[in-house]
Design a protein with these regions (language model features):
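Transmembrane alpha-helices and adjacent helix-loop boundaries
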Residues: 1-246
Length: 246
């Protein structure tokens, strides 16, 4: 081709646009499934990290530290290649879901933990004084206040997860990055490097930028309301006052 940014290169990318859309579809499918797994792991880790059991807190801490301090690529390669040598073949799609879910779940667990710990300790004590069990304390007092706090950083983790799907390229996935690489190295399409990677980058940007903006505005809105009296605190305090009066 006559140049990296030639009209012929852009025309080639446009002609094969369905390949990029297919890659985007595979990326979204992997991201959604991995996100569901990450939510489950994150919620479990967050609750374990704030539980009264020292053993559960230690297990959660070990998991988080190990996953966060080892590269995602290494975890992905281990699941795909090391297990294959052991006779366990998960396939690219399932490997991607598990690796991304396990990795992102560690970060979501920290988000859940921080959100729960942001609730004043006095509200735990007020709920205990009313005879609430653990599930009641979490359901009526703690989670209603911590969920709005954890949502903005959760959205940021969703963005990170979507971008991390690019790591599937290392195991030959059919994600957007893999499709782009196959395109630029193809016998009939090779040479359109710049247009192909620009289109790939724009697709990532179109998906990630609105989510990042939403998270930033959401967080700013929460900070503006930070000084207001928390309804959960007022409810718990009122119940304590009624019990003492009785």
């Amino acid at each position: 081709m006559s140049g990296l940014f030639s009209l012929e290169s852009w025309s080639t990318v446009w002609t094969h646009r369905e390949s990029f859309l297919l890659g985007l579809g595979n990326t979204l499918q992997t991201a959604v499934c991995a996100l569901a797994l990450a939510f489950i792991i994150g919620a479990a880790l967050g609750l374990m990290s704030t539980s009264g059991s020292k053993l559960l807190r230690i297990i959660a801490r070990i998991y988080v530290e190990f996953v966060q301090n080892t590269p995602l690529l290494l975890q992905l390669c281990f699941l795909y290649y090391a297990l294959a040598f052991a006779g366990v073949s998960l396939g690219v799609f399932r490997t991607g879901i598990i690796a991304l879910g396990v990795y992102t779940g560690a970060y979501m667990g920290e988000v859940v933990r921080a959100a729960i710990e942001s609730v004043p300790k006095g509200q735990f004590e007020a709920a205990q004084a009313q005879g609430f069990n653990y599930l009641q304390r979490m359901g009526y007092i703690i989670l209603p206040q911590s969920i709005p706090v954890m949502l903005p950083p959760m959205v940021n983790q969703v963005v990170n997860l979507f971008k991390n799907t690019s790591c599937l390229y290392i195991v030959g996935g059919a994600d957007l990055i893999s499709v782009t690489y196959s395109f630029v190295t193809g016998a009939s399409t090779g040479g359109a490097y710049a247009p192909a990677y620009i289109v790939c980058g724009l697709i990532f940007f179109v998906v990630c930028f609105p989510l990042s903006t939403l998270a930033a505005r959401w967080e700013a809105s929460l900070k503006e309301r930070k000084g207001r009296v928390n309804p959960g605190l007022k409810t718990a305090a009122k119940k304590v006052e009624l019990k003492e009066a009785a």
